[in-house]
Amino acid sequence: NPSAFNSSIPKSYWESFTVTLRDSAFFDQMEKFTGNRAGTGGLVTFKDSNWLMSIVLYHQPHFLNQPEDVQVFWGYALHPDRIGNFVAKPMSECTGADILQELCGHLNFDLEAIEKAICIPCRMPYITSMFMPRAISDRPLPVPRNSKNLAFISQFVEIPDDVVFTVEYSIRAAQIAVYELFKVDREVPPINRWDQSWKVKFDAFVKAFT
């Protein structure tokens, strides 16, 4: 039932941005700030950001044939419809320069670190559509009941107890489809039920109040 997933862009969109730099000033400051060299740490999330902005610095070069003097990083925001902390408009209305101003505001970096940067925003209207509320009948099974030659693979098939928005979900859907249709005598890797872990539940409870 596609309408369960594509009927509300405001509830299912993020905005991302890609930044291209011609010098190492920003990466040098980030390494000093985080203690991690590019490509060795995870996301840097600004928890007090109205946009809930995150960035990640990849190991460089990130692209094939990327020039030695070029550095690239990526970021995104979960609430692009909200007014920024340092830019008085929603991210969805911002230019690349506005986004960089907001980013440097959170980092307390001088704008000179990115004054020659190219920042390209990208709106992703259905990026989290697979998380939209749904009925159990809104997603098909990877192999529908009684099907002999038809299967579905995607983030929009029904796999009980699994979590969407992961590579593993897509792989598991494909494995189920292939193994069932072709009678492959092999077990699909089991799903880790982290929601049943008392440690995970306790950590989530603590995090909710900190």
List PLM regions with ranges.
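C-terminal segments that line or cap access tunnels to active or ligand-binding sites in enzymes
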Residues: 1-194
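Acidic, Ser/Thr-rich low-complexity intrinsically disordered segments
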Residues: 196-210
